[in-house]
Each structure stands twice: as structure tokens, then as C-alpha cells.
Amino acid sequence: MVPAPFFCNRIRIHTSSVKSQEEGLCVNAKKKQISPIPHVKVKAWFVKKAITCYQLLHALVREKHICVHLVSLDSWRNLANAFANEKSLFLLDLAHQRSLAQTLVHSASGLINSEASNQYVRGLMGHMATYLGELSSKNDLKSVAQQPDIILLVSCVLERLRGVASASEPRTQKAIYELGFSVMNPILVLLEVYKHESAVVYLLLKFVVAWVNGQISYLEAHETAIVVDFCMRLLQLYSSHNIGKISVSLSSSLLSEAKTEKYKDLRALLQLLSSLCSKDMVDFSSDSIETQGTNISQVVYFGLHIVTPLISLDLLKYPKLCHDYFALLSHLLEVYPETVAQLNSEAFAHVLGTLDFGLHHQDAEIIDMCLRSLKALASYHYKETASGKTGLGLHAAGHKDSGGNLQEGILSRFLRSLLQLLLFEDYSPDLVGSAADALFPLILCEQGLYQRLGNELIERQANPTLRSRLVNALQSLISANQLSSTLDRINYQRFRKNLHNFLIEVRGFLRTM
């Protein structure tokens, strides 16, 4: 087995390290009166060796039987001790801080039992959690925190914490939860202090996202309540300082730079809300969060009010942000439709505007998530109103704008838009199933509009034969295969078949009208 110092010496792939080694080679070459190795080749050789060693180090902990041997080596223990206690390893760049922390925590799977693994993690990160706690409690923190070396050190510690959090697994979950719990208050203090340091804010958010994502499924009810409360406080603090908002008074170049910078924060917040939502989908705890009166939907509701105004259609042009946003939106509407329905009119209209944008996106996955969102929205309203409740309430009703013109309700608008898409626009055939699932509850909610839209299509068809085919097809769409008005699995399947047959029958000649 290759000893740890071999890796420890070679994972430092900073330019300064490479430069000093290549200069040494060139000097030795001159002394021996031989041609020095070309500068570019020397640098490439050292970087390649360093990257190879770095990748090998990370790969060693993928198999448990290798980890069992690793943790028994003095050299591995020396590496772990150096990571926990020596300042020299803070010379590594941020990505390597995170990766090395993740690698060392993964190696804990080779220890004899869960208690030993948890103690190993505590030994690795205890000093760093203590450091953040002591730093955050300093009386002169505001001035000390702005020193470049302190900013760098805080950034390194945050990345190490993120690496540990991302390595969470059942065996080490307890220690990693305790680690995150111990730095909750320091994290909030640092967010306050570094509110104008966008790079530090981003690192801080990414740690919280990784920690919540790795922990949420395993937390008991009282622990979940603590985490949800922490996330609420984090969101409130983020919102109170207007972090993430972009001034429209900026020049075009600065505005573009600000958008690029802030979209990272928004992605992190979206991921945080998604992780919290997952508790209701995947939960390995022994008790229900309801026993503690924890309402995740409340923090999600608050988070939506913070995030949605910041997400413009321009920002949705960033593919990763766009994907995360619609993934969260579809998940929220499927799990907490009542929370979205409670949004104020401005926030709700903004959400619907982004949905309309997503329906006409080039990425089929984005369109699919929007269709799932529409299905959840329409089915929620239909079931609620069928039981005598308000459902989406005023959001679903038509209204007059400031000019006195009647504006359609949101379900009417999307029924019209979805039929237009299915009959006249280009899309992937793979989306027909998801489109059917969204169209079915929309038709049930707006049966009068469906009839009017059908009549409009019929009146525009001059050919008697084609008109007859269209009449029959429109009727079959909502009645064939014993389709009923119950939103259950069998009826969704029946409607999928009906829509497939409907499109085969009429889409061809309708597009030539």
C-alpha cells in the first residue's frame, strides 16, 4: 500500500508548487550540462502526476474492504491527524479542501462499528467547529472577519464542512448531524457578517444544502424541528439583507455579472427547499414529524416568497438554475399544492409566468416538469372544489384588469395553451403521456371552455368529412374507454389512450388548416 505522505505531498497542485519543482529540475539540468526539460512539458508532467494521485486518493475509499485496510495504516492516521490539526493543509485550494474532507470521512466505513466511525468524524472536524464558534463570538468580529486571511480560512473551513456533509451515510450520520448542529448559530452570525461577500455567502449556503440533504431523511421529529427552524432563520436573514437582489440601476456589464453571481445563490436556495420537501417523501426516522408540530410546508411557503421574485425569465436561461427551479416547483405542487395556492397574487402570477415559459422550453425534461406541475395544480383544484372547498379560489377565477378587460382564470389559460401546444406546435412524442395527465384535470375543471374551444375548431373546418371526424374525435377524447370524472390511476391511463388516438385522428389535418 502506498503511504499517505505520498498522496499528501502530491495533492498540492498549486501553481507555486509546480513552479518550484520545475525550476529545480531546470537548475539540475544546467549543472549537469544537459538540455533542460521544456517549461510547458515539465508543468504538464507535474500537473498530470498530481491529478492522477489526487484521483487515486479519492478512489481508495470507494470500497469498504479497502477502507478497512486504510484506517489501520499509520500513514493514513497521520494524514487524518494532519488534516485535523496542521495549518499547512489549508494551503490546498477550496475544491481540494472539500474533496479531502469527503475522502477522509468516507474512509470511516472501514472502522469496526458505527460508534468508532462517529468518533473518527468528531476527531476530524471538532477543532474546525470550535474555530467557527470562537470566531463568531468575538466582540470585534466585524473588523476581524474582513481580514483576507480570515476570509480565506473561513472559506476553507466551510468547504471542509461541505465535504464532510456530502459524505454522510447511516454509519456516520449521528456525528455529522452533531457537527452541523454545533455550527448553526455561527453560520447565521457569519451570514450576517459576510452579507456583502458573495463568495462566502455561496460557500455557506452550499454547506447548509449539503448538510440538510444528507441528514433530513434520517432525522427524528425533534431533530427535524430544529433543522426546519434553522432553515427558516437562515431564509429570514438572507431576505432581511436583500441578499440576492439585483439592482436595475447597474450598468449592463455589472448587471450581467451580478446575475451570474446571484444565480448560484438562488440555485442553492432551491436545492435547500427541495431537500426539506423530500422529508415527506423519504423518511427513515422512527416517528412522524407531526408529533412535534413541525410544518415543513411553512418554511417552504416562506422560501417561495423569497425566491420567486428573484427568479426572472432571464435567469431561467441558465440551464442548471432552470432545471432546479422547475424540479422544485413540480415537487412543491405535487406535495404541498395548498402552500402554493396560498401565495399572494403577485407571487402566484410570477410562478404561473414561469410555468408558461417552461411549457415552451426547448428542453423536454423542463416541459415534462411543467406538465407535472399543471397536473398537480389542476387536480388539486378539482378535488378540493368537488368536496365543497375553495381550491385555488380567486386564482382560478376570471377577473377584470385595470382596463376593464376580462382576464381568464389560470386553469382556463393553461387549458387553452396546452391544447394549442398539442394540436399545432412541435414537441417530442415522449411528452404526450405527461400532457395527457395535465390535460385531463384541466378539462374536468373547465368543461365549459373545453366545449367552446372544440366548437371553435369545428366551425373553422370547412370540409364536411373532416368536420365530422373532428366532432367525433372531440367527443371520444372525453368519453371513450369508459372514461369517468374520477381522478384515479385507471382513468389517467384511459385518458392517455384517448389523447393518443385523438392526436392521430385530427392533428394532421388541423395543422394544415
Where do the model's predicted regions map?
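Long alpha-helical scaffolds in large eukaryotic adaptor/regulatory proteins
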Residues: K64, L111, A165-S168, Q215, ...
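Extended HEAT/HEAT-like alpha-solenoid repeat tracts in very large eukaryotic scaffold/adaptor proteins
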Residues: M1, P5-F7, S16, N28-R62, ...
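Extended, C-terminal alpha-helical/coiled-coil scaffolding tails that mediate protein-protein interactions
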Residues: Q407-M513
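Amphipathic alpha-helical segments within extended alpha-helical solenoids and repeat-rich scaffolds
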Residues: M1-P38, L70-L91, S117-K142, Q173-Y194, ...
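Short, flexible/disordered intra-domain loops and linkers
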Residues: E384-T390
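Compositionally biased, intrinsically disordered low-complexity regions enriched for acidic
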Residues: D280-T294
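Short amphipathic alpha-helices and their capping/turn residues within compact interaction modules
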Residues: S240, S330, E334-E338, H360, ...
